[in-house]
């Protein structure tokens, strides 16, 4: 059993996976190979909210391998309507967890459609840009859907304006 990205993201533990499979009677340990249904294991694990993909197969040495890839959060959303969730690297909503995740937090007037589209794109941009990833602490969305950035360092609030101009505005700020 291997959780491929467990160093960076700890949403899923080996113990949790074993527990899920044991409850469903699918944990392979102690079973003969003919009694192990790898597709059922994959199907059950795919239903787990923090798993992006699970691959289960039997090796040429007759061992059962389970490889798990976790969903990767891009941005955390805490909206004015009380919603609290993550958007993952595919633009899908992930339930909030107490697990510490180092991503920018988006607050303010945010509905799910806006979060899964515009904020998702902004979050991806920040996450893949080393400079902005280290600088952006919070993204605030005003009632007019304008973006304000709260940096990790300093007391300033950076007003970016409408979200469709963010790449140009970030480039200007970085110079």
Where are these regions (language model features)?
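Short, well-structured beta-strand/strand-turn elements
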Residues: 46-62
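Periplasmic/extracytosolic POTRA-like scaffold domains at the N-termini of outer-membrane
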Residues: 5-49, 95-124, 161-163, 171
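Beta-strand secondary-structure signal
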Residues: 65-67, 148
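C-terminal solvent-exposed extensions
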Residues: 148-175
